[in-house]
């Protein structure tokens, strides 16, 4: 018996990606339903070679839904995820609404799949922040080998992480530069075309942004609360793909060659690390791919037991949609979820 899957936020960047990945991976779904707000009702979205008509979230009966992939933002998730969970569906939420709730597992399957069993408290599982997901995939195998003490990470995050309007703004501003038209800032506080913005999400009292706080708090919850981490998150004029420069200090010695070999055999990682021009991965190559790509692995001579690396991933896939579907697959493979009997 297959599963009934509802995708909430099906008209957004991540929702559309979820529908595509469900089809690509041949997820065992007998039925897939596309849901969104009332203003999107009737919109067509693609699910493989099929077209789904978007239905209204507000009027949908979730009693026979097995899995709800929620990608409609934090406010919608706060209101609807508990109701959907009570109706008996497992909600896998892509927003930040539930990530730090102690009764909600925060899961990256390559890193902490065992924690997924805790979903039964609220029938909700949280998907991490896009920049966190690729970071912990790269850190986990190294942490297992040499125990990480401290991480300093600088991110180079694409505009798709801020939604379709942000992608449109980058496109229109880039075009405006060449046509000598006025550049209009709506989504970003400063122009994004041919620029970088060291500010993602709101500022916190300590001077960090909320995006930076998410990376620090989520990495501790997923990987190890003892790890010290500092993040600087930067928006760059790239459409898809997040990049990170990561400096790691370990408790125990680990060489660059050891790290390279460990990461080559780690789930979700793909090492492309040649010390030559072009022997590394950029966000352009990572777009549309599932892996977390790791390059520029080298020892840091300024700190004992230090390494530096570069990691890149498609933020709409591993950073969001793919990770959510991998969580659903994890529940099924571990027999933590069985399909409801549907009315004939």
Regions found by a protein language model. Name each.
Residues 123-134, 207-216, 221, 319-323:
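A glycine-rich, Thr/Ser-enriched phosphate-binding loop motif common to dinucleotide/cofactor-binding enzymes
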Residues 178-183, 214-218, 229-234, 245, ...:
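Glycine-rich, charged/polar anion/phosphate-binding loops
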